[in-house]
Design a protein with these regions (language model features):
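Catalytic machinery of carbohydrate-active enzymes
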Residues: 1-324
Length: 324
């Protein structure tokens, strides 16, 4: 039995790699799959995913993992210099000047217009190309959503307190990565959008999503079909909540990738440079994208009118669908 280590940090970035993790376990069920990560705070969630055998949290002492194959989706020259000094068995990385010198890399390598989940799968293929090509079509990635831990304690209480509606659409306006680079709408814009949608579609429940650890909390007057859901730090709780949704309107952030796995239809406000890499739709669900270049704020009012129309069109489609 080999020890295959897959290394990826972050929350959303790690969720994008679930295809690769699931593929490794399906292709090599007798081997032990170890996830090495840093930044996904809910380790209990990861420990209860059946296709991951072991979790290592941190960015040091990789040699203690005793890997036979060490796969990393991190592409960084200083990190590669560190890896080169370690005894990790066979190392598979994304192409880079240093990785081409020291490690195994997927070649030929074309990633233009590929979703990051597909790029991560290239690393899995590099383990054994023939075995991968022969058996990859047998993997049903839509099954991943049924393997995620789920805890409906919070969501069950929330939905019991509210009237039943024909459809449920969540709006997620916060995202750490997008806020760091200034690529997000103003909070007031999001709140105005949620109010406008709730007035135009009274038969749909609109939910503003927030988290207990967020320093910014909503202070709005809730209506019958406009509510606020505040999740705990539990990702299993977020899974249960998202499973109740018929649609998601969100800035590009981790919940987008979770709803991608769950195949929830989504409308994503996303930077143009990540249009292909980090959006939804990679598991077969429907994803609409509203992408803009940096500097879009110069024409903010006009662009917001276009986004509002897009959100209305998305909501109309969700309303008219008999099943999602």
């Amino acid at each position: 039995m080999r020890r295959i280590v897959f290394h990826q940090n972050g929350f959303g970035d790690l969720l994008v790699c679930f295809k690769a993790l699931y593929a490794i376990k399906c292709l090599y069920p007798k081997d032990k799959l170890v996830l090495a990560q840093k930044g996904f705070s809910d380790e209990n969630f990861l420990e209860n995913i059946p296709f991951i055998d072991e979790i290592y949290t941190g960015d040091k002492n990789f040699e203690n993992l005793k890997s036979d194959i060490f796969i990393t989706n991190i592409r960084n020259s200083s990190f590669f210099k560190t890896l080169h000094k370690l005894k990790l068995g066979r190392i598979i990385t994304q192409p880079h000047l240093l990785s081409l010198l020291y490690f195994d890399t997927p070649m030929p390598y074309k990633r233009a217009k590929l979703h990051m989940s597909e790029i991560a799968l290239k690393l899995v293929r590099a383990i054994d190309k023939r075995h991968y090509d022969t058996n990859f079509s047998k993997i049903n990635f839509k099954e991943v959503k049924n393997l995620l831990p789920s805890d409906d304690t919070l969501s069950e209480k929330f939905f019991k307190q509210n009237k039943q509606f024909s459809k449920i659409i969540a709006l997620n306006i916060f995202g750490n990565q997008t806020e760091n680079i200034g690529f997000n709408l103003l909070p007031k814009t999001w709140l105005d959008l949620s109010k406008n949608l709730s007035e135009k579609f009274p038969e749909i429940l609109f939910i503003l999503v927030n988290f207990t650890h967020n320093t910014l909390q909503f202070n709005i007057k809730e209506k019958e079909n406009l509510k606020v859901f505040v999740n705990s730090d539990s990702i299993a709780s977020l899974v249960a909540f998202c499973n109740r949704l018929d649609g998601l309107i969100s800035v590009d952030t981790g919940i987008v990738h979770l709803c991608d796995i769950l195949q929830i239809p989504s409308l994503i406000f996303i930077p143009k440079h990540t249009f292909y890499r980090f959006s939804g739709g990679s598991y077969g669900g429907k994803c609409e994208k509203f992408s803009l270049e940096n500097g879009y704020q110069k024409n903010y009012a006009k662009i917001m009118q276009i986004f509002y129309k897009k959100a209305n069109h998305f909501t109309t489609r969700i309303k008219n669908e008999n099943s999602i």
